[in-house]
Amino acid sequence: TGEQLFAQVESTNNFPIGAGLASSASAFAALALAGSSALGLSLSEKELSSLARFGSGSACRSIPGGFVEWRTDPRSGESYAFSIAPHDHWRLADCIVILSKAHKAVGSEAGMHSAGTSPLQTARVADAPRRLALCRSAILQRDFSALVRVTELDSNMMHAVMMTSDPSLFYWQPGSLALIQAVRSWQMEGLAVTYT
């Protein structure tokens, strides 16, 4: 309508901000939903997901329910998330271990920009479609061992890229490796658990 509107937004989150837990995702998903509702817009889930993404890339994944895939269409430039299975498709639980509430020394956006300086980034990006297909298949088939392999591989590749960037980034805390080793030990004992 060309009309300028103003809003005051107050947001709280019970997760540490700037600690690598995508706290901006829930905030911008909520803002996209509240803003579009306040304007009386009837956006589809895809449109709402695309809108949320303008605030934070990860926010688009917080719009659809259940198990979600984030897709970018290279032809149209559209970037949105959609559900590949409902939340009750597979009973999994996330356990978030907060090793530090401190802000990361280098934020996620700066970290993403430095990823291109890593000699490993090209291989990671080239392999992404394969890992996505493995992850999607593992979820749809409820294959936990396949999900473990692809989840841990993707996490390790991401951290390898960060560690080999210029300047190098170490987001792991002193307890990170100890936790990974504990997960490996639990896996050996037969516990269905993974890390990322």
What annotation goes with each model-predicted range?
Residues P86-T196:
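C-terminal nucleotide
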Residues Q4-R91:
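Gly/Ser-rich oxyanion-binding loop with an adjacent helix/lid
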